[in-house]
């Protein structure tokens, strides 16, 4: 700064460097400093450091002060500094920075530590704090409430806020270093503990918060399963070893916060047994709290309990066996024991013994008894039955027509049947209606059919006029049952399956059936024959048949019908052989003319009188064929078939042409008759039309006259009405125009009135705003001048006013003048009274004496 005169305001300072000694000093305001030639001002006047209340700042390289607080100077007159050190200064009067001092931290508000909070501090240097010695590296807490005064030897690590521990909560802590907790207990490094005290907890300096643990709410239906991580005492002061497990229930605590030495395995739900329920607990816990491995305990309802650690249910919650009179249980002893029955008799049961209890009774099996099966009486009609096998002897028998309950030494036996028999025994298959269903079609129908119960006695309803053969393998005999009848198979009996030929021509094994229909019925076959002139023909024939059983009570006679299993195929082959032999000796023309007679003679044969017999009987199975029906005769050779077809077509054409000629003649006759009737009707219609036209002309003339009279009258009336309406309209129009003019005039007057009122209001409001604006501007100007004067200060204004004359006086003193008068041409000087003024006589007193 090159100015010679430097004005230092109050609370400002400058640093002046003496260039001769190279020593800097400080000059504080308020003062006017005149710089010497050998001095240099290092910077313009700068405001002193001001620290507001409850603030602080940090000064680097502070000056050394004596006991009285004054700066210590060295031999050169320069302030001595503590280089590299820092000093914290609190609220005080504004102070300057001495040469070499630096403001390390500007004024900063002191940190207010509230209640339930603290500052984590660490010592950087060794020092003493209120008689307590701190070593570098020490850590401690400054707890609130209070205001923390910082020190240069201490660094703040972080804020620590208290953690609120609510009801049913706990705070899990761990020691970072050997320390003493809030309760005065010594903790080693790494030790963990739990704080359950409700309220705010401020962790210590060496305490680390791991987690806030919520309590487990215990109810009557929920318990807590715990495991000890180390030897510890539980809430009942019972010592728990490492790995030991136990339960905490509602009877011990409503809410439980597990400790650090305890691990929560899970929550256990209550096991509730109804009045008719029970359960078997495996490995139950004894009175000493230890599990009894390998043992069982039966718990009966009504009861609620928790499964202890290590316990589990054998088969869950089971229902008590409530047996009626028709029910029972098959039991087996798993170990030796004694029991009493209802009569008081003692029974010694050995392992493996089987017995059965019957109702009515409510039974809960003990741990020494195993329930093998549940038995109930099987209701059977007189046509129903079951197969029962004795477990001791192995015999199987059928029980039919009575309700039966299996004993402890019996079981249901399943009778297996061949798959084809099972398919034919389905309830929805009727032997009569499905007699023409082939085996491939039957296979598709079997899908989705409910399977037969193999323990039930096999039954088959034989339809009317049918027979079934039952074979007994144990007796090696067969019996035939004629319908209508119900067949019930014994344990060693099987049904005979018939495999019949089917299709056209017949193929073996197409139709399967359990019953043999006795007829009458028919079957159809297709055979190929050859005449004497080598014409090959294909015949489709149908045969009516039935079985002739004279005495159904005779076993030999009844068994004959089953002697030939495929009676259809055998009969068709025999009849086809007869027909081919008979036709081979006949010409085609003869066969074409007499086919029916030739075929009947070939099938039934001739009697001694050369007459055709009435039937054909097969003696081996009593099959009787009664008639032959020729469905079609077709040549096998293509040329023969074409020639026959042409002849048939020619005959058809001749017949058709004759019918067409007759139809044309009849159509021509009918056409002539229709034309005559049409012409006659046309003449009659013309006469009727002329008569109607004459009547129409008469009516038109009358209508024209009436129309003329009506038009004239209507025109006159309309003109009169129009004149009347026009006059009324003119009057109404004049009235409306007058009303419109009045409304328009009133509206214009009202508009002008409102416009003048609005204009007057606008001018008044504008004048008011102008006055208000002028008043506010004057107030602002006066307030600005007042605040400016207050800001500058009276002393400053006086100094500004006196600075000019004082400077002039000093200038005159420098020139050696005792007094002087400086004026300009615009200010006159009274020289007459100047001498009196120099003598110090007031002008007014001199004038007063002169007047006297």
UniProtKB/Swiss-Prot annotation:
One of its GO terms (cellular component) is nucleus. Its main location: cytoplasm. Keywords: Cytoplasm, Nucleus, Repeat, Ribonucleoprotein. Pfam families: MVP_shoulder, Vault, Vault_2, Vault_3, Vault_4. Expression is highest in brain and enriched in the electric lobe. Closely associated with synaptic vesicles in the nerve terminals of the electric organ. The vault ribonucleoprotein particle is a huge (400 A x 670 A) cage structure of 12.9 MDa. It consists of a dimer of half-vaults, with each half-vault comprising 39 identical major vault protein (MVP) chains, PARP4 and one or more vault RNAs (vRNAs). PANTHER family: MAJOR VAULT PROTEIN (PTHR14165:SF3). Required for normal vault structure. Vaults are multi-subunit structures that may act as scaffolds for proteins involved in signal transduction. Vaults may also play a role in nucleo-cytoplasmic transport. This is Major vault protein. The gene is MVP.
């Amino acid at each position: 700064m090159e100015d010679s005169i430097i004005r230092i305001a109050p609370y400002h300072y400058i640093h002046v460097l003496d260039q001769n000694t190279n020593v800097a000093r400080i000059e504080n305001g308020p003062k006017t400093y005149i710089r010497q030639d050998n001095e240099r001002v290092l910077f313009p006047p700068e405001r002193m450091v001001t620290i507001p209340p409850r603030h602080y700042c940090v000064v680097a390289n502070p000056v050394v002060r004596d006991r009285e607080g004054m700066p210590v100077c060295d031999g050169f007159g320069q302030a001595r500094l503590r280089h590299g050190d820092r000093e914290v200064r609190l609220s005080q009067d504004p102070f300057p920075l001495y040469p070499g001092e630096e403001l390390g931290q500007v004024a900063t508000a002191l940190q207010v530590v509230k209640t339930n909070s603290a500052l984590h501090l660490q010592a950087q240097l060794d020092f003493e704090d209120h008689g307590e010695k701190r070593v570098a590296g020490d850590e401690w807490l400054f707890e609130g409430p209070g205001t923390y005064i910082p020190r240069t030897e201490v660094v703040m690590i972080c804020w620590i806020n208290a953690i609120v521990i609510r009801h049913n909560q706990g705070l899990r802590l761990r020691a970072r270093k050997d320390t003493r907790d809030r309760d005065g207990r010594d903790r080693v490094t790494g030790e963990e503990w739990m704080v359950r005290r409700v309220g705010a907890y401020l962790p210590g300096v060496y305490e680390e918060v791991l987690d806030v643990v919520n309590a487990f709410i215990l109810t009557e239906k929920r318990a807590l399963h715990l495991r000890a991580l180390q030897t510890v005492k539980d809430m009942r002061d019972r010592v728990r070893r490492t790995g030991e497990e136990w339960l905490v229930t509602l009877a011990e605590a409503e809410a439980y916060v597990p400790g650090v030495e305890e691990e929560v395995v899970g929550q256990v739900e209550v096991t509730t047994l109804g009045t008719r329920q029970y359960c078997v607990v495996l490995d139950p816990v004894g009175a000493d709290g230890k599990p009894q491995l390998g043992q069982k305990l039966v718990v009966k309802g009504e009861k609620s309990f928790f499964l202890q650690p290590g316990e589990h249910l054998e088969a869950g919650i089971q229902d008590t066996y409530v047996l009626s009179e028709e029910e029972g249980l098959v039991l087996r002893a798993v170990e030796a024991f004694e029991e009493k029955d209802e009569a008081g008799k003692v029974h010694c049961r050995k392992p493996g013994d089987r017995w059965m209890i019957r109702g009515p009774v409510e039974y809960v099996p003990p741990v020494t008894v195993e329930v093998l099966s549940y038995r109930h009486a099987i209701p059977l009609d007189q046509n129903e039955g079951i197969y029962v096998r004795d477990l001791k002897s192995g015999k199987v028998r059928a029980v039919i027509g009575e309700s039966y309950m299996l004993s402890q030494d019996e079981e249901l036996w399943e009778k297996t049947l061949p798959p084809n028999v099972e398919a034919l025994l389905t309830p929805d298959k009727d032997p009569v209606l499905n007699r023409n269903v082939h085996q491939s079609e039957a296979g598709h129908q079997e899908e989705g059919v409910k399977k037969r119960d193999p323990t039930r006695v096999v039954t088959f309803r034989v339809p009317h006029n049918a027979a079934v053969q039952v074979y007994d393998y144990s007796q090696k005999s067969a019996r035939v049952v004629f319908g209508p009848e119900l067949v019930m198979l014994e344990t060693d009996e099987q049904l005979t399956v018939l495999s019949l030929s089917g299709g056209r021509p017949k193929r073996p094994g197409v139709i399967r059936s359990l019953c043999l229909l006795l007829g009458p019925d028919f079957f159809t076959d297709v055979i190929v024959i050859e005449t004497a002139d080598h014409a090959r023909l294909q015949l489709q024939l149908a045969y009516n048949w039935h079985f002739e059983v004279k005495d159904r009570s005779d076993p030999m006679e009844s068994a004959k019908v089953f002697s030939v299993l495929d009676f259809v195929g055998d009969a068709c082959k025999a009849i086809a052989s007869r027909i081919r032999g008979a036709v081979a000796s006949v010409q085609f023309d003869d066969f074409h003319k007499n086919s029916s007679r030739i075929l009947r003679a070939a099938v039934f044969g001739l009697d001694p009188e050369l007459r055709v017999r009435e039937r054909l009987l097969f003696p081996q199975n009593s099959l009787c064929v009664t008639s032959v029906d020729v469905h079609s005769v077709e040549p096998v050779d293509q040329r023969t078939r074409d020639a026959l077809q042409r002849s048939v077509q020619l005959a058809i054409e001749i017949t058709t042409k004759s019918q067409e000629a007759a139809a044309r003649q009849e159509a021509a006759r009918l056409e002539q008759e229709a034309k005559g009737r049409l012409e006659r009707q046309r003449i009659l219609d013309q006469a009727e039309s002329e008569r109607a036209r004459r009547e129409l002309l008469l009516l038109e003339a009358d209508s024209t006259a009436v129309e003329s009279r009506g038009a004239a009258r209507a025109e006159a009336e309309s003109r009169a009405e129009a004149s009347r309406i026009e006059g009324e309209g003119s009057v109404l129009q004049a009235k409306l125009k007058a009303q419109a003019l009045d409304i328009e005039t009133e509206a214009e007057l009202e508009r002008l009135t409102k416009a003048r009122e609005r204009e007057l209001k606008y001018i008044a409001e504008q004048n008011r705003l102008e006055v208000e604006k002028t008043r506010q501007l004057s107030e602002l100007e006066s307030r600005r001048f007042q605040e400016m004067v207050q800001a500058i200060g009276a002393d400053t204004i006086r100094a500004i006013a006196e600075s000019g004359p004082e400077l002039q006086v000093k200038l005159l003193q420098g020139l050696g003048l005792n007094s002087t008068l400086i004026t300009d041409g615009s200010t006159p000087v009274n020289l007459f009274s100047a001498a009196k003024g120099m003598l110090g006589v007031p002008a007014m007193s001199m004038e007063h004496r002169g007047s006297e």
